[in-house]
Regions:
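Sec-dependent signal peptide recognition
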Residues: 1-8
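Formylglycine-dependent sulfatase
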Residues: 6, 15-232
Length: 232
């Protein structure tokens, strides 16, 4: 069985019941995090122009939050808050690129101490305290690819079968600078709507389609992971 929880970040939970009716196997947990993707630039949040079919499907089968907010709209402070459960002003790292204290506890560290295999793949950008919580860290771009997602499917495939796992999959998509990828051309400059707060010109439209193409790449790898989880 695979169950889903969805918000600006995405968590997939898969679990199974053992033959003992009184015992439930601990759930496997997978977290997906995009980089610099606005909440309303996904189909499930009403954007009719971006192609995000895998995320949209998960959202339709799970829970979607429509009243959730950031306290700091910045990369590393948000990551540290998500993985620690603390507000940015309580992590010691409310500013971009600042590191929390080494003694801070993270979710994967707690899970690891309770028998979970823990793995990170893609963009890290959190601090040494968070490394302590992972059995494996794969933050090399040569391994993960330009979008940070290419190792994800293999990580699931290689996950141990004799213990539950927690996987933290963080992409570089759709952070600037945008470059060509296998999904370049998915979106057309003449077939999108420019938000009212932006100047509707050729440069803006080109920026938007390049941005949308990287969202589609992120979405594609989420679909690959979901299929691999079903096989596993």
């Amino acid at each position: 069985i695979i169950s889903y929880f969805f918000t600006a970040l995405l968590i997939i939970q898969s679990y199974s019941c053992s033959s003992d009716k009184n015992k439930v196997t601990p759930p496997n947990l997978v977290v997906f995090i995009a980089d610099d993707v606005s909440w309303d630039d996904l189909g499930c949040y009403g954007n009719e122009y971006v192609q995000s079919p895998n995320i949209d499907l998960l959202a339709s089968e799970g829970i979607i939050f429509k009243n959730a907010y950031l306290t700091t709209s910045s990369c590393s402070p948000s990551r540290n808050s998500i993985i620690s459960g603390r507000y940015p002003h309580n992590t010691g790292a409310a500013e971009l690129h600042t590191m929390p204290p080494i003694e801070m506890i993270s979710l994967p560290e707690i899970l690891k101490s309770n028998g979970y295999f823990t793995l990170q793949a893609g963009k890290f950008h959190m601090g040494d305290y968070a490394i302590r919580g992972f059995d494996e860290v794969h933050d090399d771009r040569e391994v993960n690819g330009k979008g940070g997602e290419e190792y994800w499917e293999k990580a699931v495939e290689n996950a141990p079968n004799d213990q539950p796992f927690f996987m933290w999959f963080a992409s570089y998509d759709a952070h600037r600078a945008w470059g060509e990828n296998q999904f370049t051309g998915t979106h057309n400059v003449d077939q999108i709507k420019v938000p009212e707060y932006l100047i509707d010109g050729p440069e803006t439209r080109l920026d938007l389609v390049n941005y949308y193409d990287e969202i589609t790449r992120f979405d594609h790898y989420i679909g690959e992971v979901v299929e691999k989880l079903k096989e596993k």
